[in-house]
Amino acid sequence: MDSDETGFEHSGLWVSVLAGLLLGACQAHPIPDSSPLLQFGGQVRQRYLYTDDAQQTEAHLEIREDGTVGGAADQSPESLLQLKALKPGVIQILGVKTSRFLCQRPDGALYGSLHFDPEACSFRELLLEDGYNVYQSEAHGLPLHLPGNKSPHRDPAPRGPARFLPLPGLPPALPEPPGILAPQPPDVGSSDPLSMVGPSQGRSPSYAS
C-alpha cells in the first residue's frame, strides 16, 4: 500500500512539472515593432533640407567646398545631403558633393568638416506633424539654423527652432548607351531593301555604279 501511495505522489509531481513546462511554452510574447518608419541605425537617405521658417528667406541648406554653410534659393549639388541614422532619433548630415559633415559649434555656428566629430556633428531629428523636421545638436541642445543676413544697424532677433522640410534627392540620370542609332527606312530601289545581305554579297551587277 505504501508503494502505491509513493508511486502516486511521484506521478503527481511529474504531472505538475510537465504542466509548468507546457504553460511556459504557451505563454505569448510581444512581437517587436518592425515598422519601416522607425529610424534604425545605419539607415541612409538623400535629401534636400528646405526651410521657409520665419527667417525672411526660403533656402536649401548647402555645405560648400570651403567648409562654410549657407542657404541657396534653388537646389544645387552642394545642397544634396546624405542623412544617416547613428541610433534611433540621432543622425549625421553629410554633403554628397563636398564630403563634409555638417557640424555645430557650442555658440550655434555651423560649419562643414571633412572629419566626423560625434560631439559636434550629431543631431537629433524631431519629426513634426506637418511633415517638417527640427534638428538639434545632440551635445549642446541648440537648434539648427541657417546663417541669417547680418546687419550692422540692428541686433539679431531671437529665433526659435528652424523647421526644415526634407525633400527627396533624385538620383542622377543615367547616360544613354552609345552606339544605338535610329533605324533607317528601307531602300525600295535596292535589291536588298531590308539590308539582310552584306554590302558586297548578293548584289546584282545591274545595280553597280
Curated annotation (Swiss-Prot):
Keyword tRNA processing listed: no
UniProt protein name: Fibroblast growth factor 21
Localization: Secreted
Record keyword Oxidoreductase present: no
InterPro entries reported in the protein's UniProt record: FGF15/19/21, Fibroblast_GF_fam, IL1/FGF
Record's compositionally biased regions (Pro residues): 168-186
Primary role: Stimulates glucose uptake in differentiated adipocytes via the induction of glucose transporter SLC2A1/GLUT1 expression (but not SLC2A4/GLUT4 expression). Activity requires the presence of KLB. Regulates systemic glucose homeostasis and insulin sensitivity.
SUPFAM superfamilies recorded: Cytokine
Subunit structure as annotated in this protein's UniProt entry: Interacts (via C-terminus) with KLB; this interaction is direct. Interacts with FGFR4.
Leader peptide range in chain numbering: 1-28
GO MF terms held by the record: fibroblast growth factor receptor binding; growth factor activity
Highest taxon above the source species: Eukaryota
GO biological process: cell-cell signaling; fibroblast growth factor receptor signaling pathway; neurogenesis; positive regulation of cell population proliferation; positive regulation of cold-induced thermogenesis; positive regulation of D-glucose import; positive regulation of ERK1 and ERK2 cascade; positive regulation of MAPK cascade
Gene3D superfamilies: 2.80.10.50
Organism from which the protein derives: Homo sapiens (Human)
Keywords: Growth factor, Secreted, Signal
